Structures are given as structure tokens and as C-alpha cells.
Amino acid sequence: MIYIIGLGPNDSSNIKENIKNLLLNNTSAKIIARTKEHPAIDFLEQNNILFETCDKFYTESDNFENTYNNIASYILEVAEKNDVMYLVPGHPMVAELTTQLLIKNGKNVKVIGGESFLDSCFNAAQFDPVEGFTLADATAPETLSSVNPHNHLLIT
């Protein structure tokens, strides 16, 4: 089983209690974080929770598509022998390509959501997304040609 778990957009104060409990009470799943470069990782370190990261894949690949494909392949390989808790920043279903790859190629995948970075962005910019907004991928600049200039724009 692969559990894709969202750590929220910033420090451990935004990790949901059910997720904290899953991590603290884990006895058998291998914990793999997409990156150590996220403030919520401190929660794992402060609680002596063993984990590894996928940071090496960022230096081994020359583009994000290859990086995320390699991460997903690695998670799927590990999941053949162990349950995996794969930790991602924010919410697993928001701007997280590895989630889509794992859902598409995995057998048993469960998504456990955390707070999305979008919540913080909407709050900081003080607008309601129902007013209209576009979320664009900075690695795919061709998508910017279809942006509605009357909508709020967030480029990730």
C-alpha cells in the first residue's frame, strides 16, 4: 500500500492531527519524503521518526518531468516489498505530479490530504477563488497564452 500524505504548506503546526498520529504510530511502513527542504520535516526529526528523502533525484535529472518520473518509479519499487508513506508538501492532489503518476501506475494508493499551499495564497492575497483564478505551471509557459487577464493568476 502506498499512502501519499500531505504535510501542509509550512511548519509542523499545519500538519493535521490524524497525519501526525499516523506518523507517530507507524511501525512498519517505510517513510519517504519527496524533499527534506520543507519546514514540516522538522516534525519527523523532533520525534525521531526515521525517513529518507528523494532529494537525490533532483540532482540526477536535468528536468522536472524526469525527476518526478524517477521518484514515482522509486516509490513503486519500494512499495513492492513494503508499505510506503510518501510525504509531500501541501496537499497531495494540488500541483503534485508524483501523486498523479503513483495513482496511475500504483495498485493500492491512498491519498491523505493536508492543507494546500493554495489556502495560504488565497488568504495572503485576500481573494475568494470563486471570483475566478488560474493556477499555471511555471515549467509549462505555453499554458500562459490562454490565461484570462480578468482572473487572478498564481504561477507555481
PLM regions with names:
Residues 36-39, 90-92, 115:
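Short glycine-enriched loops at secondary-structure junctions
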Residues 1-58:
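Glycine-rich, flexible N-terminal cofactor/catalytic loop recognition
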Residues 76-79, 99:
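Ligand-binding beta-strand-loop-alpha-helix segment within the catalytic cores
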Residues 46-50, 105, 126:
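Short helix-loop-beta junction
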Residues 63-75:
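Glycine-rich, highly charged phosphate/nucleotide-binding loops
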Residues 14-15, 41-43, 60-66, 119-123, ...:
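Short, charged, surface-exposed secondary-structure boundary motifs
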Residues 2-5, 10, 22-24, 29, ...:
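Beta-strand/loop-alpha-helix module characteristic of Rossmann-like adenine-cofactor folds
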